[in-house]
């Protein structure tokens, strides 16, 4: 490994704080626009959206196709990923939960984890400036 690479991209030490967090939200597909608008209203400018399939307590559901009944185990969901400065995370999570909630099983989950660093490839900006 090149010495310069290690120095420039060294991992954060365990006792250092994490100034950024990654929010991953799994939501119902029809709630995407509502969640996107809620995040935009609080100034969140970027996110990654992926179509995913999964199940939790909701499990699958039964459908009939050409006269045969079968169980659909994996349900279509949307996964949102965004990285924000630590101070903006609570507002973003609250916006996601409020906009995604139907009150019914299968509304989804929100996960928040630490992000050690971010690098904008085009400009080499790091940390908050990169997100």
Question: What label would you give each PLM region?
Answer:
Residues 2-131:
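Positively charged, small/polar-rich N-terminal and surface patches that mediate targeting and assembly
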